[in-house]
A protein has these predicted regions:
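Bacterial N-terminal signal peptides
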Residues: 10-22
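Flexible coil segments in periplasmic/lumen-exposed cytochrome c-class electron-transfer proteins
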Residues: 99-141
Length: 141
């Protein structure tokens, strides 16, 4: 038997594995965030009621020292993550006096508001409240 023919089954197997792995790569499935202008407006209202005291009226000038939620700090802290990472963090830890007390829709709307203040534009498609679905949405610009 020719030496190259004895390698054929292994080569075919390795090629099949490579194709399957590349098809299952999560980063290939990531998209940019989707949200609506209505979500941004609802998010602005919710932000002003629940977040402004710590993070400020301009998202970077809070009275109680909350970190900036726009600009360089936001990009450096969240830019490599997903929308789901941001929403999951907010739901688990915000507001600090009673984390998780807001509705799923309110957290999602506030995230849409934050996205709109960090260079993302509404595209007319609702940002889903499901954090798993948001994990597929990259914050990388």
């Amino acid at each position: 038997m020719h030496p190259l023919l004895s390698c054929a089954p292994f080569t075919a197997f390795a090629l099949a594995v490579a194709v399957c792995v590349s098809a299952a790569t999560p980063s290939a499935a990531q998209t940019g965030p989707s949200f609506t202008a209505d979500q941004v407006e609802r998010g602005r209202t919710a932000y002003n009621q629940n977040c402004q005291e710590c993070h400020g009226s301009t998202l970077d000038n809070g009275e109680f020292g909350g970190p900036p939620l726009k600009g360089g700090y936001f990009k450096n802290h969240w830019g490599a993550g997903s929308v789901g990472d941001l929403t999951g963090y907010a739901k688990a830890l915000m507001p600090p006096d009673r984390p998780g007390r807001l509705s799923e829709q309110t957290y999602t709307d506030v995230v849409a508001y934050l996205l709109s203040n960090n260079g993302f534009a509404p595209d007319g498609k609702e940002l889903p409240t499901d954090v798993a679905a948001q994990q597929k949405m990259s914050l990388k610009k």
